[in-house]
Amino acid sequence: MCLTYYHPHWTGLTAYAKRLAEGLARRGHQVTVVTSWFDRSLPREQMYNGVRIVRVPAPIRLSRGQVQPTLGAVVRRLVREHDVVQVHTPMLETWLVGALAHRAGRKMLMTHHGDLVMPSGWWDQFVQRTVGYLLDRAAACADVISIHSQDYADHSDYLRPHLDKVVAIYPPVEIPRPDRDAVVAWREELGLNGAKLVGFAGRFVEEKGFDYLMKAIPLVLERMPGCKFAYAGDPNVVYERFFQQCMDLFEPCRGHVTMLGLIRDQQKLANFYAMCDVFCVPSRTDCFPSVQIEALLCGTPLVTADIPGARQVVKATGMGLLVAPRDERALADGLVQVLSDRAAYVKPYEEIRATFNPDASVEAYERLLQSMAS
């Protein structure tokens, strides 16, 4: 399994890969993860939860990616020890890994986590075109491409030429059940008792559309003056200073937004979701934000932009409301609607878990990988 970042780096993509790798290892398979040595305090090689992790030096960072000059040599050595290769994209060297796998007589599964969509600046657009070209080559040499939903694949310019290779498998999402006593205490500690609370989470980057939420907040407050908002995530993203660009929108809302920072502890994250009355996903583009499933499993309905991929969770469960994308008024209307009649949108935990079952996802990948290895 190859990907740019792996544990302890934490994004939806790395969480997905970690759950899948460890799930396959628990089923008795030998799993090796090849990833960048992005943090030199980590060991170059280690076993973690049954998974062998091999980290490759990455002396150059290219926007969100890591350039790994010796990756080819590492993959060439390891590929013959394994029956099939999986690559999680976006990853600059996917095409190289695919070529080396084929040279060794192995097949490559490319797991696509979303088209690369960068801000409009010349450098970001250069990166998008460069990486896009490399990913086009990768898709062409992939034997199978897995994606989180067929909806996203059908609307992806990048995947459309390769739909005959695409298999849709829901991501393996896991999160503890919320601690209700801790939720009540945390609300009180933050001074949020009695307030309607809207949660949002993730990297504060342009594609997440948080600027539309900032524009929607005053519109919500006109109709629900006591409403509060809570953000779980890192606003200061190294490769994209979008939060700083949004300060004119954020400053008027500052008194209504509680900044919680990046929450790494999974129990605390579950408590965050449960603390919120509604969870908001205002993305411009998003393949399949796993935060949506986490929120639903913690009993919190969604208000989500009606875009390919992201809308699949609401469509599959009915636990939330879809609103027009890139439209702060539609977003505000949706938030007020769900906050005003929250119980109408809440579904039983068992229904959500039956739809998004991590064991079923790992089993589906196991069957797919075994078919490719045979």
Which residues make up each language-model segment?
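Short alpha-helical donor nucleotide-sugar binding micro-motif in glycosyltransferases
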Residues: V79, A270-C276
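Aromatic "clamp/platform" in nucleotide-sugar-dependent glycosyltransferases that forms part
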Residues: P90, R284
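Nucleotide-sugar donor phosphate/pyrophosphate-binding loop at the beta->alpha transition
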Residues: T70, K107, V117-R137, D154, ...
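Conserved donor-binding/catalytic core segment of Leloir-type glycosyltransferases
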Residues: L192-K208, M214-I217, A230
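A short, active-site helix/loop in glycosyltransferases that binds the activated sugar's phosphate group
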Residues: G132, D136-R177
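Short hydrophobic beta-strand element within catalytic cores of glycosyltransferases
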Residues: P301-T304
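Nucleotide-activated donor-binding/catalytic signature segment of Leloir-type glycosyltransferases, i.e.
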Residues: F243-I263
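Conserved acidic donor-binding segment of nucleotide-sugar-dependent glycosyltransferases
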Residues: A316-T317, L321-E328, V336-R342
